């Protein structure tokens, strides 16, 4: 799967989103009543022909607005973290869930219009879970004309034999799946492995490690594997799960359930996901603020000695004189102060001089 290139080009989100949706459609959607925002797509309403046409028009306009939003978020994530470069072969790991379908769909669109050349190939690992509908993904990918590989490997039996009864299979299953996909990416020459984790997955992992792992870490948007053989990317890093749910409904992806093995989601992660949903309902900007904080880390304000050299901190005072501004300084046990060389009558500056400018002094030696 080779591609010829001329000169290197950058991935510009403006090129991605330009002319994707008609401005008139945007205006129409913006004027819709907010109560209709989560209209169920499967409602069976008794509508007249005119109402049916209008209803379909509203849904179409709303979908185009959502589609534009997701494409823009993905293209910005790709640009911000240099996820995809000219000549890359991107292996999209497709599980049959809403996230990986959405990721694949958007990357295929970006491939067609991006100012750089890259290839996309879908890969699914059939782990032989009982009841797994083996024909669903191959049929979908074939119908869409998407180049793909379906890998068959009975990791389910391995997981079942090593995980104690009553424990969740998810962690062991994920590790085995990851190892198989990493190796296959190298085998076919894929230069990037694209995973479908979204913003809420990243936040949940952050709190899982914070509450139960004693560490400040999450899922990075881009990661070099421990063996340095693969680069993982998460182009949905800026996308909210609730938008993916809506997008998948609109697109009517053939979703394959993720709990065919009967294993339940990790209880700790499930509780954190519930917490995040409650926060989002009560405080719509809270999750966005937390994610922004993950991009704005100040190592000197934390306590990790590996990230910041606290031991080497030294004073760097100049010779300028700074007097206390106030009304009085009471001195106690002056003889002890004198013995250690500290002033017994410190100079004082009238507080009025500080208030004359009608502003609060902003000097903060701790933060500065």
UniProtKB/Swiss-Prot annotation:
Q: Which UniProt keywords apply?
A: 4Fe-4S, ATP-binding, Cytoplasm, Iron, Iron-sulfur, Magnesium, Metal-binding, Nucleotide-binding, RNA-binding, Transferase, tRNA processing, tRNA-binding
The record's annotation in InterPro entries points to: Rossmann-like_a/b/a_fold (IPR014729), TilS/TtcA_N (IPR011063), tRNA_Cyd_32_2_STrfase (IPR012089)
Q: A GO BP term, please?
A: tRNA thio-modification
**Major site of localization recorded for this protein:** cytoplasm
| Further comment | The thiolation reaction likely consists of two steps: a first activation step by ATP to form an adenylated intermediate of the target base of tRNA, and a second nucleophilic substitution step of the sulfur (S) atom supplied by the hydrosulfide attached to the Fe-S cluster.
Gene name, please? ttcA
Q: What is this protein called?
A: tRNA-cytidine(32) 2-sulfurtransferase
Q: How is the cofactor bound?
A: Binds 1 [4Fe-4S] cluster per subunit. The cluster is chelated by three Cys residues, the fourth Fe has a free coordination site that may bind a sulfur atom transferred from the persulfide of IscS.
Q: What family does this chain come from, according to its entry? A: Belongs to the TtcA family.
